[in-house]
């Protein structure tokens, strides 16, 4: 069970300071060199050298980088144009892709991707709906007779 009270002392009950000398010498943080991690580059440097990594003093001293907050960072799930061409052929064989004016229509969000990159080659005319596409990906798809349509969605 957690104790929710400060433990008292039974030692030296008759004395005023319980063996800590002058009144106030065992109060607050003056006798311990400061509160918390104060003084690690001054009078507590020996603790840094003893318990920290050699040379850097981590984790006691120095800067430790930056962690992007989760709501700001976007998790990208990219797909290359060449992989998309293979995927279209598989979906066409299964009958899961629709045609519109002789071109295959693909929505990358429905397939679990949110970015189109320009790696590989494509020879099929396709209409691709995607939130983001690279310039080379757009050029390759337009060269094959297709088009890229950018859709605006919240990436979360």
From Swiss-Prot:
One of its GO terms (cellular component) is cytosolic large ribosomal subunit. Residues 1-37 are annotated as: Disordered. InterPro entries: Rbsml_uL15_N, Ribosomal_uL15, Ribosomal_uL15/eL18, Ribosomal_uL15/eL18_sf, Ribosomal_uL15_CS. Pfam families: Ribosomal_L27A. Keywords: Ribonucleoprotein, Ribosomal protein, RNA-binding, rRNA-binding. One of its GO terms (biological process) is translation. Residues 1-16 have a biased composition (Basic residues). The keyword Nucleotidyltransferase does not apply. GO terms for molecular function: rRNA binding; structural constituent of ribosome. It comes from the Archaea. PANTHER family: 60S RIBOSOMAL PROTEIN L27A, LARGE RIBOSOMAL SUBUNIT PROTEIN UL15. Belongs to the universal ribosomal protein uL15 family. Binds to the 23S rRNA. Part of the 50S ribosomal subunit. This is Large ribosomal subunit protein uL15. It comes from Pyrobaculum aerophilum (strain ATCC 51768 / DSM 7523 / JCM 9630 / CIP 104966 / NBRC 100827 / IM2).
């Amino acid at each position: 069970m957690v104790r929710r009270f400060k433990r008292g002392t039974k030692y030296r009950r008759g004395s005023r300071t319980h063996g800590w000398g002058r009144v106030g010498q065992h109060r607050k943080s003056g006798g311990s060199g400061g509160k918390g991690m104060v003084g690690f580059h001054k009078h507590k440097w020996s603790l840094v050298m003893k318990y920290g990594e050699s040379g850097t003093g981590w984790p006691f001293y120095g800067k430790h980088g930056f962690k992007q907050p989760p709501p700001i960072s976007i998790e990208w799930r990219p797909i290359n144009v060449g992989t998309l061409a293979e995927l279209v052929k598989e979906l066409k064989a299964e009958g899961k892709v629709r045609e519109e004016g002789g071109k295959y229509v693909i929505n990358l969000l429905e397939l679990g991707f949110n970015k189109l990159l320009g790696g590989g080659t494509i020879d099929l005319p396709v209409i691709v709906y995607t939130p983001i596409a690279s310039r080379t990906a757009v050029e390759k798809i337009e060269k094959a007779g297709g088009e890229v349509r950018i859709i605006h969605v919240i990436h979360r």
